[in-house]
Amino acid sequence: MGAAGDLPYSVLADFYERIESTSSRLAMTDYLVALFKKTPPEVIDKVVYLTQGQLRPDYEGVELGVAEKLALRALAKASGRHLKDVEDLYKKTGDIGAVAEKLLTAPGGGLLEFFGTPVQKKELTVSQVYSALMKIAQASGEGAQETKVNTLVALLQDAKPKEARYILRTVLGRLRLGIADMTILDALAAAFAGSKAARDVIERAYTKHPDLGYIAKLLATKGLDAVASLKIEVGIPVLPMLAERLSDPAEILEKLGGKCLAEYKYDGERVQAHKSGDKVLLFSRRLENITHHYPDVVEYVKRLKVREAIVEGEIVAYNPDTGEMLPFQELMHRRRKYDVEKAMKEYPVRVYLFDVIYMDGEELIEKPLDQRRLILEKIVPEGDEDILLSTAKVVGDAKDLLHFFEQAISEGCEGVMCKSIGPGSIYQMGARGWLWIKFKRDYRMEMTDTVDLVVVGGFHGRGKRAGTYGALLMAAYDPETDTFKTVCKVGTGFTDEDLAKLPELLDPYKIPHRHPRVFSKIEADVWFVPAVVLEIIGAEITLSPLHTCALNKLEEGAGLAIRFPRFTGRYRFDKKPEQATTESELIEMYKSQKKTALQQS
């Protein structure tokens, strides 16, 4: 065994191998429970981070930053092979982990063995692997590449073949276990608290403080009460509240108790802005730190009339000559790593704020929306043209709501967000519910609204598409079961450039069997960990015996499918797979489409 308070990395590698080989979600959770029970509390945080394929929570932005070429160089050096031989083997297999395992298992698999000297490898621990990976992530400036290579070489020389497989996959961000945060929460609750009530407490804490490593360590060392007492903190993003969708104004008002706050749904990038004095941090919908991309937005947020706050809004690109809002695609020019100042001048933005979650030491999530809106109105500077309140009005009539919706569309918005303003209109962190409802363009016989679906499988291309994917199997997310259910196979809408890019984009997520969280009747040629989200449009939503989305929910033996699906060209890198269109949204779209068709006939 490893040192006291540590865990041999081989134990982790053994569990990863078991998790990787199962297509059962329950088995995956059971393996995690067993792993967490075996892990000393001192390193439970590191085990959780490594299992997520990262070193720190998303919002800290710690990236390993190891390119494929650099990893291959390190492997060649560690195994005593020629770089070309290692590259050729990698081209054949496409899995650097498998290449490492093969090279380090083979006779002469290691530099000292290569020169005929037997070597006694010391046992690697989780702490040693984690520290080495952190050293690689933090290497910068002159000589950083050599530091990364040398650190990785030293790690691989001490690693057993199976350990090397997972170390290299981790380094390249290709662990491929596809374990959802919610599955880790299930396993932590079972391992350390053992009840459904405890699971709810842990999830609630996670929505306020989405750092699973930190929560795991707190739970293992100080217990459930310490986890339950976690508070919202400026600088740590909360999980954003999500919305359902409907397309009938009367039905929306009925769901929201007869009246609602209707608010423009801007075609921009959702942002959670944290202000503490003159310090401002910006986080995306995925909780990534995007402060660097928007130095102008940082300045706008500083103008808020408050010392400390967490506010939510939408960053929207606009035409400085006309003042008109520009579509989301224009905003993507702002996501550059370099020439940020140039992009800022070429693509100016405004921020439209729609919520406040925390202010001057007080959590506001339990306050109803109308009160939060009043607080927000007080802190936004009057007459400011860069940081503004979202355009909104209280409506209690279907005609008024429709008129407001048409006004929003004419001004370049996607539609309208309709929000409950009753006493129970709290801010539900991380939850999708009927307190917020998206009202977007009507789903007539042709599907005029897009959906965001997750790539779960692929089919080999033929002819012109040989060497890439001819079609992709797409799925919607079901939060009830934490699974991805298929809804279509899409092969149209991809440009030649897209097709060339698909293997590069998807192959890092390739796995040898259907992922445990994917529910599919269709057998794909290739399976992927659910990770990549694409925007899809189609002719209509129909019943289908082939797909599993809403299976048996509308008709026995049938699920929902999108007819004539087409990729719009928009990659939703801003969305985690769990933020994709849900099964319940597709059910509502189908019902709405059917109702509209009946009215038209």
Curated annotation (Swiss-Prot):
One of its GO terms (molecular function) is ATP binding. The keyword Heme does not apply. One of its GO terms (biological process) is cell division. ATP binds at residues 263, 270, 285, 314, 354, 432, 438. Disulfide bonds: none annotated. CDD domains: Adenylation_DNA_ligase_Arch_LigB (cd07901), OBF_DNA_ligase_I (cd07969). It is an enzyme of class 6 (ligase). Gene3D superfamilies: DNA ligase, ATP-dependent, N-terminal domain (1.10.3260.10), DNA ligase/mRNA capping enzyme (3.30.470.30), Nucleic acid-binding proteins (2.40.50.140). It comes from the Archaea. The keyword Ion transport does not apply. Its EC number is 6.5.1.1. The active site is at residue 265. It catalyses: ATP + (deoxyribonucleotide)n-3'-hydroxyl + 5'-phospho-(deoxyribonucleotide)m = (deoxyribonucleotide)n+m + AMP + diphosphate. Pfam families: DNA_ligase_A_C (PF04679), DNA_ligase_A_M (PF01068), DNA_ligase_A_N (PF04675). Its cofactor is Mg(2+). Belongs to the ATP-dependent DNA ligase family. DNA ligase that seals nicks in double-stranded DNA during DNA replication, DNA recombination and DNA repair. This is DNA ligase 2.
